[in-house]
Amino acid sequence: SYVNSRRPQSVTFVASLREDLRRRDFTINAMAWNHTGGLMDYFGGREDLESGIIRCVGNPDERLSEDALRILRALRFASEKDFRIEPDTYMAMRRNLSLLRNISAERIAYELSRTLMGKGVFSALMNYPEPLFEIIPELRAAFGFKQNNPHHIYDVYEHTLRSIANADADLEIRLALLFHDAGKPLCYSEKEGIGH
């Protein structure tokens, strides 16, 4: 069992490679190479890798509750590799979001930083926003918030993500863009039918 949804209470070595790989987070990380037998892939990792899919090994609720950081790792892999998260895995991520409260701020910051720097950051955070809203709840109000302005054709959240995706690959710039309109829904006003 795991302590605080992060660390195993104890580590037990197993003699079976299959059993060892079964304990991994995602199928793409649950493969091994044997110099005589070649690729050992019991859980479809190669197919998921080739198809660009992030999928938990076995029961996704069990994998994510063992180590809640896996929720943010799935998001990071989706961003870095420009992969999709398999629907059952994403639904389990959403069900287990509250476990992120057990994760240290340093680990969350590390995963968020890598996510923001990924080549697929727009699609990852647009398609799978809930983990971001759990760790930065102030951003939730931007999702779907229409700006009603001819200079802003996207809602605040999509505008934010497009800004990040089109910015230089500089973490400070991307962090600034993540927060640059976070307060807009709270101070929005209209004058002559135009949003400000």
Segments the model singles out, each with a brief description of its role:
Residues 1-196:
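Catalytic cores of the polymerase beta-like nucleotidyltransferase superfamily
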